Amino acid sequence: MDQRIIASSSTREDDAADASIRPKRLADYLGQQPVREQMEIYIQAAKARGEAMDHVLIFGPPGLGKTTLSHVIANELGVSLRVTSGPVIEKAGDLAALLTNLQPHDVLFIDEIHRLSPVVEEVLYPAMEDFQIDIMIGDGPAARSIKIDLPPFTLIGATTRAGLLTAPLRDRFGIVQRLEFYSPQELTRIVIRSAAILGIDCTPEGAAEIARRARGTPRIANRLLRRVRDYAQVKAAGHIDLPVAQAAMQMLKVDPEGFDELDRRMLRTIVEHFDGGPVGVESLAASLSEERGTLEDVIEPYLIQQGFLIRTARGRMVTTKAYLHLGLKPPRDRAPGIGEPGDLF
């Protein structure tokens, strides 16, 4: 599947742009107020005691600022940040090399921590609890274990799939934070801030139009801002106001709900081919010529969160809201947009 303009996964362009607009302090980290307030207390307490802050688990959908928050935490603590990801740490020795190079109170950030191998996890447990690791030296009968002391450090683990974490690993995090989708008002503030940093001429109304189509996700909001900037430079002398933002979104085929053509095609397929559902995910994937994982991880979450799609024990169903969005008359027995319990698919 081609990269979607409203995909919440990161691209190289996103990574490069994020580096320039990423907030450095909690005061500049917009949204997620409960998380910010709690982290401010934890950070100040750790600094006052002169200790490493407790280990932190951050989870939530992609694009909400987990990596950004880890940078902010390290900056607020005044320590260095080492960044890696679960799939990169293939062997216990890889993790040992990272840990032994940390300075006291440093922050180690592991993205996609749910993808750590069991062997690596076993090494991580004593490192998190006792700041020690056991390394095997030699092979066969001559092999022996050496215990290495580590400096006190803070591990920040980030994941989009908290349910895949093993219980022993999850229990070793003293601080657990869930990031929620952002409101249009919060995203508007983020777009205005990003536009100012990037030198983009954008009115509050133009920023609000971009924000309301960004699916509650800062990464998407910033990506849409860059594409609208391109449109404005060619069509509107670089000025982004409400009409320019709307015209750019029409060109990008992102509707007012933040849906692109793939979202609309999925809803339309359920309505036209399966009478609105329920339909099993395998049948739906075959009809759309998409992989099951793409439907479950990329397309469905936002449709469900916004009340356009529900999952039942018998499969996927669209709601009245979906019919109205497609300009169709809903059947009388159609669900109004509230999910049903049970999901076996």
UniProtKB/Swiss-Prot annotation:
Stated name of the protein:
Holliday junction branch migration complex subunit RuvB
Q: Which organism is it from?
A: Xanthomonas oryzae pv. oryzae (strain KACC10331 / KXO85)
Describe the subunit structure: Homohexamer. Forms an RuvA(8)-RuvB(12)-Holliday junction (HJ) complex. HJ DNA is sandwiched between 2 RuvA tetramers; dsDNA enters through RuvA and exits via RuvB. An RuvB hexamer assembles on each DNA strand where it exits the tetramer. Each RuvB hexamer is contacted by two RuvA subunits (via domain III) on 2 adjacent RuvB subunits; this complex drives branch migration. In the full resolvosome a probable DNA-RuvA(4)-RuvB(12)-RuvC(2) complex forms which resolves the HJ.
Asked if the record carries the keyword Nucleotide-binding, the reply is yes
Which reaction does this enzyme catalyse, per its entry?
Answer: ATP + H2O = ADP + phosphate + H(+)
Q: What are the boundaries of the region Large ATPase domain (RuvB-L)? A: 1-182
What is this enzyme's class at the first EC digit?
hydrolase
**Which keywords fit this entry according to its UniProt record?**
ATP-binding, Cytoplasm, DNA damage, DNA recombination, DNA repair, DNA-binding, Hydrolase, Nucleotide-binding
Give EC number(s), comma-separated. Answer: 3.6.4.-
| Molecular function terms, GO-annotated | ATP binding; ATP hydrolysis activity; four-way junction DNA binding; four-way junction helicase activity
Q: What task does this protein carry out? A: The RuvA-RuvB-RuvC complex processes Holliday junction (HJ) DNA during genetic recombination and DNA repair, while the RuvA-RuvB complex plays an important role in the rescue of blocked DNA replication forks via replication fork reversal (RFR). RuvA specifically binds to HJ cruciform DNA, conferring on it an open structure. The RuvB hexamer acts as an ATP-dependent pump, pulling dsDNA into and through the RuvAB complex. RuvB forms 2 homohexamers on either side of HJ DNA bound by 1 or 2 RuvA tetramers; 4 subunits per hexamer contact DNA at a time.
